[in-house]
Amino acid sequence: MVSPDLIRNMVGIVGNIISFGLFLSPVPTFYRIIKNKDVQDFKADPYLATLLNCMLWVFYGLPIVHPNSILVVTINGIGLIIEAVYLTIFFLFSDKKNKKKMGVVLATEALFMAAVVLGVLLGAHTHQRRSLIVGILCAIFGTIMYSSPLTIMSQVVKTKSVEYMPLLLSVVSFLNGLCWTSYALIRLDIFITIPNGLGVLFALMQLILYAIYYRTTPKKQDKNLELPTVAPVAKDTSIVTPVSKDDDVVDGGNASHVTINITIEP
């Protein structure tokens, strides 16, 4: 009979692969930002929340806090690096208002993590106690991470457009939450179960919204506009063009037409 630990590890490896795909799913969004040199209506909220979430889970999975959690550490360590790259790009192409907001949030997150690490290592002296404290924080901020797309979901409902809610991100979020919820239920870990269970719910809501508003999303206009065809003008040609009698005065009186003589040198 296959042991639960083996099954759990296998599910965890699959979860690592799916989570890696989740971390990479915004790449088209950031390619678009770099190409346009503008963040447009994209929000930094999900990436700021994910950054803090990754930092907390890396700390949670360390041997000094929660032993035998290497799968938690590996994927969140990778995610931490990827999110840092995303936020750097977002910062570079944001306006001053967004840059200031991001700076405040990032500084707050750094101070918060420093306080958590020092508080746990100096104030809690057993793995059980450290796991409890950090696990509660992970559950809280993991829930915030998964709920951060709610701001984008509200925008979808308001604009009836899914342009700024990538389908790939929603699909991978659903699969990721489903996998890690299963992982946590094999050997019950309530701190992993809560945020990922909610992640499944929120991702499902996004997929439903996508199905509802996909057809009402405005199509992008073709930037390659066709210019009107201009017939060649012959040498010494006179062109008669209508003129609004209320707008133009010719020789002190109103004129309905103006004759323009064009001479083309050979």
From Swiss-Prot:
GO MF terms held by the record: sugar transmembrane transporter activity
Transmembrane segments: 10-30, 46-66, 70-90, 102-122, 132-152, 166-186, 190-210
Identification of the protein by name: Bidirectional sugar transporter SWEET7b
Known function: Mediates both low-affinity uptake and efflux of sugar across the plasma membrane.
Family per similarity comment: Belongs to the SWEET sugar transporter family.
InterPro entries assigned: SWEET, SWEET_rpt
Any single GO CC term annotated in Swiss-Prot or TrEMBL for this entry: plasma membrane
Subunit description: Forms homooligomers and/or heterooligomers.
Organism: Oryza sativa subsp. indica
Keyword terms: Cell membrane, Membrane, Repeat, Sugar transport, Transmembrane, Transmembrane helix, Transport
Residue ranges that the UniProt entry lists as topological domain Cytoplasmic: 31-45, 91-101, 153-165, 211-266
Membrane topology (Extracellular): 1-9, 67-69, 123-131, 187-189
Topology term for the membrane: Multi-pass membrane protein
PANTHER family, A to Z: RAG1-ACTIVATING PROTEIN 1 (PTHR10791), SUGAR TRANSPORTER SWEET1 (PTHR10791:SF30)
Superkingdom, taxonomy of origin: Eukaryota
Residue ranges occupied by any MtN3/slv domain in the UniProt entry: 10-97, 133-216
Annotated localization: Cell membrane
